[in-house]
């Protein structure tokens, strides 16, 4: 079996997923796609175009960590590459990344360099969110001291974005996989924190570059996305800091975004986003992506019940069944 198992999760991003898999052709890796109850024919398209890719076709919608946990538990590689469907690369560099991890046995997570489609670098590694980093963010208005990605050398970082993240299975076996109480956002930060406490390292690895196209799944629902992002951050603060520390972090972060909204008040779109971030940093109000998935699952359950009542059901396909 290959050393690397690729865990891809997809929700209604058929074309992005197919482009990602196209760029993975020839990679020496086990590739597993979990389709998160898509309605755009994603699973069928993957089966048709990539017969060597294993597909787990899920009938309900779950969160980022829960979905990747399903794939991690179903794969066998010594390393698991957690990957967004909205990524591509001209050179995934699995051999280089595996060689680096083999040579550095206490490194549990390796995050490659991320760039936008136009080549601009994307911040992909940061310091852990804490009262101290929140205070620094307030003083500098978010301009300094938190991002750790960048440069040409491999370096230790606090946490790296799970849009593309190579994980050592041995370390996951020790500390556990993603905490499924995080629906989406901050689950990789929490995992990196648990790894650090157990003596493992996370590193930024700029010798592999991944293009992050940023999925449009949440396009049109920016408020829900922002709500979910801050819900994850509040859970992280509450899990890893005292109640007082979590409150200080929330207030400093909210004040930072409020100040940025005031400074650029004439830019209505920007100021509006900053005010929304400020509100949610202090305390999330309103539904997020979790509720969107729950509503969809509830609606599908009601439709299935109606079909059963009228005798129009068919046996559902099991996860991974061709």
Predicted features, each with a name:
Residues 58-75:
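Glycine-rich, basic loop-to-helix element that forms the pyrophosphate-binding segment
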Residues 12-26:
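Short, well-formed alpha-helical segments that are part of the catalytic scaffolds
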Residues 23, 35-44, 60, 90:
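A conserved acidic beta->alpha catalytic loop
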Residues 129-158:
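Short, flexible, basic/aromatic active-site loop/helix in glycosyltransferases
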Residues 80:
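Short aromatic/hydrophobic "clamp" motif used to bind/position activated sugar donors
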Residues 158-209:
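A short, conserved alpha-helix in the catalytic core of glycosyltransferases
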């Amino acid at each position: 079996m290959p050393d690397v198992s690729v865990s891809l999760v997809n929700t209604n991003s058929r074309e992005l997923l197919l482009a990602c898999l196209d760029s993975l052709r020839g990679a020496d890796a086990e590739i597993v796609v979990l389709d998160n109850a898509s309605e755009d024919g994603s699973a069928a398209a993957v089966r048709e175009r990539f017969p060597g890719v294993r597909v787990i076709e899920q009938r309900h919608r779950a969160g980022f960590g829960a979905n990747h946990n399903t794939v991690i538990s179903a794969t066998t590689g010594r390393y698991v590459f957690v990957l967004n469907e909205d990524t591509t690369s001209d050179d995934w560099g699995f051999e280089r990344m595996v060689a680096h991890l083999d040579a550095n046995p206490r490194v549990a997570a390796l995050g490659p360099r991320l760039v936008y489609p136009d080549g601009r670098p994307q911040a992909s590694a940061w310091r852990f969110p804490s009262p101290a980093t929140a205070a620094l963010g307030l003083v500098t208005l978010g301009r300094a001291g938190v991002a750790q990605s960048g440069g040409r050398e491999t370096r230790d970082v606090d946490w790296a974005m799970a849009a593309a993240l190579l994980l050592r299975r041995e370390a996951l076996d020790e500390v556990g996989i993603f905490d499924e109480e995080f629906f989406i956002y901050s689950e990789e930060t929490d995992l990196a924190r648990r790894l650090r406490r157990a003596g493992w390292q996370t590193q930024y690895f700029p010798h592999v570059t991944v293009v992050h196209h940023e999925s449009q799944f949440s396009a049109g629902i920016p408020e829900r996305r922002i709500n979910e992002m801050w819900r994850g951050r509040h859970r992280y603060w509450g899990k890893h800091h005292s109640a007082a520390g979590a409150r200080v972090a929330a207030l400093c972060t909210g004040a930072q975004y409020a100040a940025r909204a005031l400074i650029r008040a004439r830019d209505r779109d920007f100021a509006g986003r900053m005010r929304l971030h400020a509100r949610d940093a202090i305390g999330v109000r309103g539904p997020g992506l979790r509720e969107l998935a729950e509503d969809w699952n509830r609606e599908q359950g009601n439709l299935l019940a109606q079909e059963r009542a009228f005798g129009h059901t068919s046996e559902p396909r099991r996860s991974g069944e061709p």
